[in-house]
Amino acid sequence: MISMLRCTFFFVSVILITSYFVTPTMSIKCNRKRHVIKPHICRKICGKNG
């Protein structure tokens, strides 16, 4: 039981850390490419935030 909780906590923390670092990088790339690529393509890549 303890090992299961530990494994789940580790898995969730990895996902949170990954999303924390990936999301700003995506938005930065989106902002740079916005002038070159059409905005609707940028929205598809970056989601509603971009």
UniProtKB/Swiss-Prot annotation:
Its main location: secreted. Pfam families: Bee_toxin. The modification N6-formyllysine is found at K29, K44, K48. Expressed by the venom gland. The modification Asparagine amide is found at N49. Potent anti-inflammatory agent. At low concentrations, mediates the degranulation of mast cells thus evoking an inflammatory response. Also acts as a neurotoxin capable of blocking a class of voltage-gated potassium channels. This is Mast cell degranulating peptide. It comes from Apis cerana cerana. The lineage of its organism: Eukaryota, Metazoa, Ecdysozoa, Arthropoda, Hexapoda.
